[in-house]
Amino acid sequence: MTIAITGGGTGGHLTIAKILAYELKKRGLKTIFIGSTNGQDMLWFENSVLFDEKYFLKSSGVVNKKGISRILSLFKILALSFGCRKIFAKHDVKAVISVGGYSSAPAAFWAVANKIPLFIHEQNAEIGKINALLKRFAKRFYSSYFEPKFDYPIDEIFLKTARIRREVKTVMFLGGSQGANFINELAVKLAPHLAEFGYKIIHQCGEANEAKMREIYKKESINVELIGFSKMLHKFVESADLCISRSGASTLWELAANAVPAVFIPFPYAAGDHQYYNAKFLEQFCKIVRQSDADEERIFSIIQNFDVKAASIGLKKLIKPDGAKKIVDDIIENLKNEDKK
């Protein structure tokens, strides 16, 4: 049996694609990936051995387009969707798992049109446009925010290395793989104060910003463990006692799984303000500060007064393992029932 995983564009979608593919591979099931030439899909999976085959279509987003551009993009998606017939026929695809994002549209639409079971995973607290459109046609809709709730699929390494934080000794700034400019600028402003009070600083700034950030810290004579981007990010997260971060789905759940308390500064221009609502889900154990209110004085005060022990204990109790296993179990059970009909 071959299962197609589709979707991506950004790390939040692609992380779930990777984790679910790994779980399917453990069961001996064949998987193919259908993504886009745009976004980060090729960066993540072009050379990956996780999938039996990968396809990258020339799909692009529709949400922010208007007028004739929007109409043309919709026609392009329909054309790409029709083009999926050869891929599905070649691999005898029996089910499609969509992780959302614009690159999920062609394969997900083709699945619906041809009554191939569609399973959707939504990472955010505000449902993405494509997922919202296709939810009614899906065999199952998996979410950690909406009923019936499923545990979030998380890379096991974050759970295995989780520890209770008892005080703040090390502060980590997470700018993401692309580097969030606001987080980077905030880190630079806070670094002298943090260093003065004896805090160790870890700053993940994005590859494109690494040289510039290194020069700034060198000029200010501030000792910072600076990372552009690392596939071993969990090692740095494990060292942190408190993180200053955006609240994209994967980042939020990975920090929670490692029991790292966080000050979340949601990206204000995220679709549907979903980063804010993601963070609200962990409101009991984190601090949420709107970007317009996130000046260095306020953030420094939060760092100094954060009860990280209580938050860390709460996070460790909240996050459950085997999220991916439970979802794949459910998918397989649904497909077995489908075969009996």
Curated annotation (Swiss-Prot):
InterPro entries: GlcNAc_MurG, Glyco_trans_28_C, GlycoTrans_28_N. It is found in: Cell inner membrane. Cell wall formation. Catalyzes the transfer of a GlcNAc subunit on undecaprenyl-pyrophosphoryl-MurNAc-pentapeptide (lipid intermediate I) to form undecaprenyl-pyrophosphoryl-MurNAc-(pentapeptide)GlcNAc (lipid intermediate II). Keywords: Cell cycle, Cell division, Cell inner membrane, Cell membrane, Cell shape, Cell wall biogenesis/degradation, Glycosyltransferase, Membrane, Peptidoglycan synthesis, Transferase. The gene is murG. Pathway: Cell wall biogenesis; peptidoglycan biosynthesis. One of its GO terms (cellular component) is plasma membrane. Belongs to the glycosyltransferase 28 family. MurG subfamily. This is UDP-N-acetylglucosamine--N-acetylmuramyl-(pentapeptide) pyrophosphoryl-undecaprenol N-acetylglucosamine transferase. It catalyses: di-trans,octa-cis-undecaprenyl diphospho-N-acetyl-alpha-D-muramoyl-L-alanyl-D-glutamyl-meso-2,6-diaminopimeloyl-D-alanyl-D-alanine + UDP-N-acetyl-alpha-D-glucosamine = di-trans,octa-cis-undecaprenyl diphospho-[N-acetyl-alpha-D-glucosaminyl-(1->4)]-N-acetyl-alpha-D-muramoyl-L-alanyl-D-glutamyl-meso-2,6-diaminopimeloyl-D-alanyl-D-alanine + UDP + H(+). UDP-N-acetyl-alpha-D-glucosamine binds at residues 10-12, 124, 177, 275. It is an enzyme of class 2 (transferase). Its EC number is 2.4.1.227. Gene3D superfamilies: Glycogen Phosphorylase B (3.40.50.2000). It comes from Campylobacter hominis (strain ATCC BAA-381 / DSM 21671 / CCUG 45161 / LMG 19568 / NCTC 13146 / CH001A). Its main location: membrane. GO terms for molecular function: UDP-N-acetyl-D-glucosamine:N-acetylmuramoyl-L-alanyl-D-glutamyl-meso-2,6-diaminopimelyl-D-alanyl-D-alanine-diphosphoundecaprenol 4-beta-N-acetylglucosaminlytransferase activity; undecaprenyldiphospho-muramoylpentapeptide beta-N-acetylglucosaminyltransferase activity. SUPFAM superfamilies: UDP-Glycosyltransferase/glycogen phosphorylase. It is a peripheral membrane protein. HAMAP family: MurG.
